[in-house]
């Protein structure tokens, strides 16, 4: 009986730790993304490699830049995304995006102290490029699979659609300040 009680206590203790693995994000508005990012690029991505830093695995994507709205990335820029495969280990991070080769994106990124670039707010800074029926370029961000908190507390995330021209104007205004 004592063994069963100890087993149950251990199981409950482990279950209590499960929520600690969740990802919680602060909601970033388009103005936040524009203002706080190091760079904004329209680009096509390809996975390059993975690495491990402080126990966390990252996948690095090389972005073939077609246009830069902020920063000076050159023809290519690399961004690291939490999660991936490294030396036989796999790590998943809730809310971390996986870029698909051949898909055109607009990516808001920031540069860390080590010089590594990261997508803003995990997937919040990643938009797929599409054209609407009239031919106008629109950017779509998928709904986040993690908890997102705004000024009023927890808010459901439904994704975001933004017109390319609108983003160009916002980025130009911010650059002029």
Place the predicted regions along the sequence by residue.
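Bacterial N-terminal signal peptides that target proteins for export
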Residues: 1-10
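Transition segments tied to proteolytic processing and entry into folded domains
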Residues: 7, 17-177
């Amino acid at each position: 009986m004592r063994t069963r009680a100890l087993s149950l206590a251990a199981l409950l203790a482990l279950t209590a730790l499960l929520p600690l693995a969740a990802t919680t994000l602060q909601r970033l508005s388009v103005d936040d993304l524009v203002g706080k990012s190091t760079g904004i690029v329209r680009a096509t991505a390809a996975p390059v490699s993975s690495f491990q830093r402080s126990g966390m695995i990252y996948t690095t994507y090389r972005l073939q830049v077609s246009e830069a709205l902020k920063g000076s990335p050159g023809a290519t820029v690399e961004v690291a995304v939490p999660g991936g495969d490294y030396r036989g280990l796999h790590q998943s991070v809730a809310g971390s995006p996986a870029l698909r080769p051949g898909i055109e994106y607009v990516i808001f990124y920031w540069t860390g102290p080590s010089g590594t670039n990261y997508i803003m707010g995990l997937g919040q800074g990643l938009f797929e490029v599409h054209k609407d029926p009239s031919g106008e370029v629109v950017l779509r961000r998928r709904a986040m699979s993690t908890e997102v908190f705004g000024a009023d507390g927890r808010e459901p995330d439904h994704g975001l659609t933004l017109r390319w021209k609108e983003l160009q104007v916002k980025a130009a205004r911010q650059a002029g300040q």
